[in-house]
Amino acid sequence: MRINHLFLIVAALATLSMTSCTSPMEKRTNQAIQQVMDEFQAVGVSAAVVKDGQIIYNQSFGYKDLATQTPLSNDDMMRIASISKSFTATSLMQLVEKGIISLDDDVSDLIGFQIRNPHHPDVPITLRMVLSHTASIRDKENYSTLDNLNPAVGGDCADSYYEYKPGEGYNYSNMGINLAGAILENMSGVRFDQYVQDSVIKPLGLHGGHNLDAIDTTKIACIYHRSNDQYVESNAYASVTHRLPDYVMGYSAPMFSPTGGVKISARDLATYMMMHMNYGELNGVRIISEESAKTMQTPVWMAQNSNEEQYGLCLWEFIDFIKDEKYNTPGNYLVGHTGNAYGLYSVMIWSPQDKWGIVAMTNGITHIKVKEFRQTIVNAIYKACIKE
C-alpha cells in the first residue's frame, strides 16, 4: 500500500478533539508534538511523559493505518525495535540474581557451543561483553539465526567478528543480543518470549510482548517506510506459529528477535521505564534488584564526544541529547535507549536525578530527516512538558 504524504495533511484533524478539557501543559505538549509531526511528515506519533513516579502525559496523533484512515490511539502498540534489548537484559539479570549465571561467565558455557573470536581464540567472551556490545561480535546480513556464530555450521566464523580483542572495543551488535536471548532460554529452560512475558511484562501489568500470536493484534499499528516520496507499509510483523514445530530450545530464540521484537504502547513502555527509573521496582512489584538495575545503567564502554556510545547493559547513557546544559555534565546524564527498524523510530529516555522520563514513537516519517526525529521530538516534549 503506497500513500502520498499529502494524504497526511488530514492527520491534524485527529488531534482536534484533544484541544478541549486539557491543561495548559497538555495543550503546549500537544502543539509541540504536532509541529514535529508536520516537520517530519509523520504518519503517527504516540508519546508518554513520566514525572515523579506518575504518567503525567499520554497522547497519540495521526494514523494507526493509512489505508483505513484509522486514528492512532493510546492503546495501540508498535514494534519498538532496539529498546527491546533492555527487556532481554532485564530478564537475564533475574537469572544472575538467582545465581544461575554470572555476567562474567564465558558465553560458550551458557549457550552450549564454542563462542570465540578467531582473532583472539584464547580470550573468553563474557555475557557482560555481549550485553554491552564489547564482545567484538559483528552483525552480518542475517542475524536472525545463531548459525553465523556456531562453528558446527559456520566453520571458524571469522567474518562474524571484528579484529579487536573482546572487551577492548565497541560495536553495536544485534547478533550479540539475539545470542543473549538464546542464553536466557537455554539457562532458564523457558522459551524466550514466554520468559519475558511471565517475568517482566505481566508482573508490571503491561500488554504486548515478542510473540505476535500471543497479543491483541487489533491493537497493532502499521509501520511505514518511504519509497519514491510515498509511504509503503513495511513487513514489521510476522507470525511465527508455522515455524514453531522446528523450534530448538536454547538456539531458536532469534525467531522472536530478542534484539528488537517487543510490541508495546507508549503508555506501557513508560510504565516499564518507571520500573527502571525506580531501580527495578514499581508499585510494590520488584522485577530486578536495585543493584542489578544500577549495573544495567552503569556504562561499561565509554567514548568521548558521542551521544550514544556510553553504553551499560542494553541501556545508553546519553550526552548532548537534550538541549539543556544541565543534562550534559557528568553526574546528570540521561539514560535509556532508542529504536529504529522498518520505518519505526522510538526513544525511551529519563533523568535518574530529576525523576522525569519521555517515551515517543512514530510509525513512519520522511526519510530525509530520520536521524533528527528522536532528538527533535524529545526536546520538544521536554520543553513543553518538563522544563516549563
Predicted regions and their residues:
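Hydrophobic helical h-region of N-terminal Sec-dependent signal peptides
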Residues: 9-15
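Bacterial N-terminal signal peptides that target proteins for export
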Residues: 1-8
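Short, surface-exposed loop or secondary-structure junction motifs
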Residues: 65, 118-335
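C-terminal motif of bacterial Sec signal peptides marking the signal peptidase cleavage site
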Residues: 19-20
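Short, well-ordered beta-strand elements
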Residues: 337, 345-364
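Short, conserved catalytic-motif segment at the N-terminal edge
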Residues: 26-78, 100, 151-160
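Short, gly/Ser/Thr-rich active-site loops of penicillin-recognizing serine hydrolases
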Residues: 306-309, 320, 360-388
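Short active-site loop at a secondary-structure junction
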Residues: 36-46, 67-129, 164-175, 257-260, ...
